[in-house]
Amino acid sequence: SIIADDHGRFSGLGLPCHADIVKGWGPLGGIYTALHHARPGGCFVVACDMPFLSGPLIRAMAGLTAGSDVLIPYLNGNYEALHAFYSPGCLEPIGRSIQRGERRVVSFFEEVAVRRVESAWIKEIADPARVFININYLDDLEKF
């Protein structure tokens, strides 16, 4: 599925498109909406501006999800929250974060089981410098 505040823009792609349930909450609101519409096992969330995804990395990460509510890459002291798996167990904690006015994706992590995927493990499968790059302008894309 595609989650976007302007979901009509993507309706021609042949994929289910859903508007944010909670408007104006950025990535946390998008994850909340994705989980609301997800299958019972949860979902993999990725940002729309990450064009160099690695299928092998995503599949390998999927194999690590058992026992965790959030499976998330952790590189250079930062979480890659928009390249992560989220279980249905995150839905209510995210809802509480939104009610408290918390906008940071990590705001609910203390309430759920989080498993970090360390950079050394990722580097065995994919190049983090490429996989986690964000392209915000066409000029950025031309560099690759």
What are these regions (language model features)?
Residues 122-144:
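Glycine-rich phosphate/pyrophosphate-binding loop and the adjoining helix
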